[in-house]
Amino acid sequence: MMSARRDSAKITPKEPRDKPRGSLQAFPNQPESKVVDKVVVSAAEAVNGIVDGSSLAVGGFGLCGVPSVLIAELHHSGVTDLEAVSNNCGVDDWGLGILLKDRRIRRMVSSYVGENKEFERQFLSGELEVELTPQGTLAEKLRAGGAGIPAFFTATGVGTQIADGGVPWRHAPDGSIAKSSPAKETREMDWHGKKLTFVLEHAITTDFALVRAWKGDRHGNLVFRQSARNFNPLAAMAGRVTIAEVEHLVEPGEIDADAVHLPGIYVQRVLALTPEQAHDKHIEHRTVQPRTNAMNGAAQ
């Protein structure tokens, strides 16, 4: 489990809102509630406190839902020696790939890394330590960290090097394996009337989390859109200080409570994107057909 740092910037609450309405008025000695406005004015303020050696949980899947503005600001700040937890590491010129390219990331915990050639080069040359983790297990490790569950048992990985140990974590410059994963605890349990073996996986918590949301309010309540939801809520739960860049900032109360994907209790800072930033989205592989062919195919 990654240790949570205590050197992050403190967020000071703004002025309290008007007196609460309704039944609370019947209790004159009831203290007024203080609601924190979590909006920051710049990307630099948003990433303030992220220092060399910090651990980060970063949302996104491929290039979808990636907090690209926050990552770019981190790159601009010069911070280095980072430990990043993310499903993948972007591509060579986008997402976490821009940090990786300049050797800002020391260690990655990831599930899929096949789209980044620089990632492969650094891993095989011994410059980067990588803990490959099954995708579903990675998702649950992040969720467990946010839910206060220190560890859990899963059937995923039983009978493989994930459970038995020996997955290469770091190579030596000559290509040999310098560090590999340790063996994990396994246990037999009754499951649907059968004795099955499960492996113990530990939760992940990080110093900071960087996520991207489609909509958010000043209290940090977030709504994600379609595929961009992916690992973002899970990463947000795992971070001690969670920073969200949002495409559309709205006032408190404009998001229906039933529509909230991630409650504001998990979010400490909100950065409103400009329209240009919100529309700057990349894809890995364009697979569309020419319009004429697509129309002919539909007619058939």
Spans of features found by a protein language model:
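Position-driven detector of the extreme protein N-terminus
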Residues: M2-S3, N296
